[in-house]
Design a protein with these regions (language model features):
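Alpha-helical linker/hinge and terminal dimerization helices associated
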Residues: 7-8, 44-45, 66-88, 150, ...
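Short beta-strand-centered segments that line the small-molecule binding cleft or hinge
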Residues: 2, 111-114, 132-168
């Protein structure tokens, strides 16, 4: 057998993350090991999977076909492994939880400690996505639960949800940013002249969400909400932040709120999970997440305690 599930997992990670280095981080390997596995796969199969003639390696037609069919095999293998363990014990081999970047993953640490105390043998894997990326991970069965997903879920069903409520976003800049002393409310014409810091939608296949980005505006894209906060505190751009993220920096004076002409409406979040073939681990996490108010408390106050 020239194909292995490990090589298909690496190929999938490269395609989703956009680079060998990012894929290596996801699969917990050094980049050179990922490069070696890809070249070995190409040698074993006798076909090029990546075209390396340009600035960035791109999948060949054969590589695209291998990726698409390989994803079917990965899903089937994962479902088989989980089914076998559920039949034997009722507990999944692994449970994947995707956490939207708007939610500090540290809020899950107390729940993970409770889950560890069960000694179920189920491995927990945490993923980080933004906006539609959380839904995509759920619908592609790369994740079993989505924590803090945007409430406007895609059509098609196959999942259940639990509302987390709304949170407020505020438009903020650093005190030394040019907009800090600009007349309020800030108009779209004024904002157009300044760079926005954004966490882009991480969905690769689904239609993406975009909030409050003006057509033609300069954009600094960062990988997480924590990076967005840091960039705006550093004065590298402007933009909306969820109030829970902004609050400590507003209290310290590291950020200031500016009124804008077009006020952003409050956003709604939810937990979502696959509603079919639920094992004991998924049931435990759903029951625990929907009965605890730690995330709702943070959304309301910004308090991580």
């Amino acid at each position: 057998m020239r194909l292995s599930l490990e090589s298909l997992e690496i190929l999938d990670a490269i395609a989703r993350r956009g680079s060998f280095a990012a894929a290596a981080e996801e699969v917990h390997r050094v980049p050179s090991a990922v490069t070696y596995m890809v070249r070995k796969l190409e040698d074993d199969m006798g076909v090029p999977i990546f075209d390396r003639s340009g600035h960035r390696a791109q999948l060949t037609a054969a590589g695209v076909e291998l990726l698409n069919e390989g994803r079917h095999l990965l899903r089937a293998a994962n479902e088989l492994e989980c089914r076998i363990k559920r039949i034997a014990t009722g507990w999944e081999t692994e449970l994947a939880i995707v956490v939207d970047t708007i939610i500090p993953v540290t809020l899950l640490w107390p729940l993970l400690k409770q889950f560890d105390a069960l000694n179920s043998g189920t491995r927990v894997r945490l993923l980080h996505e933004s906006l539609g990326g959380s839904w995509e991970a759920l619908l592609e069965r790369r994740a079993d639960i989505a924590v803090g997903a945007i409430a406007q879920g895609p059509s098609g069903g196959g999942y259940s949800t639990h509302a987390l409520g709304e949170f407020r976003s505020v438009f903020v800049v650093a005190p030394d940013h040019p907009l800090a002393n600009a007349a309020e409310p800030l108009s779209a014409q004024v904002l157009m002249q300044h760079r926005a810091v954004v966490v882009p939608d991480s969905a690769r296949q689904m239609p993406t969400y975009s909030y409050n980005i003006l057509s033609g505006q300069d954009i600094l894209r960062v990988p997480s909400m924590a990076d967005k906060v840091a960039a705006q505190v550093a004065g590298l751009g402007c933009g909306y932040l969820p109030l829970p993220w902004a609050k400590p920096y507003l209290d310290s004076g590291a950020l200031v709120i500016k009124a804008v002409s077009e006020v952003r409406p409050q956003s709604r979040l939810c937990h979502a999970w696959r509603s079919q073939d639920a094992g004991q681990a998924l049931k435990w996490w759903v029951e625990t997440l929907t009965s605890t108010d730690a995330i709702q408390h943070w959304l309301a106050t910004g308090d991580l305690e």
